[in-house]
Amino acid sequence: MKLILAPMATLTHAALRSTIAQFGGCDEYYTEMIQAGTLLTGGPFEKYYLFTDPEPEKIVWQITGGKIPAMVEAAKMLSQMDGIGVDINMGCCAPDIVRSGAGIAWMLKERRETEELVEQVGAVVRGAGKRFSVKLRLGDEDFTEESFFSFVDMLAQRGVQQVALHPRTKKEKYRRPPRLHYVGQLVRYIEEKGYAIQVVLNGNVQDSESACHAMNQSPGIAGIMIGRAAAQKPWAFRQIAQALGRDTGREEDRSEPFTVDLLETGCHFVRELEKFQPQEFYKTRLQRFFAFYSDNVQFAHHLRTRLLNHPTPEGCLQQLEEYFAAAPHERFKEENPPHEQFNVL
């Protein structure tokens, strides 16, 4: 079972990956979605999206864009870099992205246009010896099982090797629980058809208990993709790996509890952000991370407000130091592994 970091704008950059790696890392790190057109024009900030630290061999480059030629050229460029492969974003529902013809718009366009995109991008990625994957949703609000599985047929017939399904529709976002049973149906459908595609589940997995629930709802999946929970708890992958009975990459016995230093972990993220991101990105990246990370303490709203109001490296370091100086009992968080390993049905 692969454990995978989901692609998240302003979050899944090298600083977060480095913070996760402190706790043993994960199997695949999807990047922030990279705008194909901007990458090709060589914008001043594009190089910051191309760092592969700390584990280059585990990088999955996710691209987005509404124009086929730019997507193909971006895929060609990224296929020559370190990493597992290239992923097309067909799931983002942000209005600006959809209006540009990118993200989930590819699931809603005239089928022939999307077929052409998949054929051409897949050819350059596989030609470079890299894996070709797609991240998608169920479709629009009026989707049917027939239309969804027909779309999967198209992907499979054009050489997609892995799909990550976020089982919500375009408008559902996080308002309702993900329909995990569709992931299980997708696994069975692919098996019945004999397609050589791995299925990854994405949606509301936060810890070992929710991972176990997801696996029972969707037997046969090849991996679990974790998003926001990895920002709140960069050690979440380690917890789940322990529950799976896997080697966590740590010297400690995987059955033993482990202690997280919340001050040091937060400070580590800030220091890594300074190393891997331009000053122009500090505010958005700090605010985005600490909006989630603050939930680890008792007075989360208080700490979050202080951090979001001081969105500079110096400001965040100071606020973290002051908070834990006033509440030293909250600094060290003991994480206990489950009493038993996953009982997957």
Language-model regions, residue ranges each:
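Flavin-dependent oxidoreductase catalytic cores
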Residues: 1-345
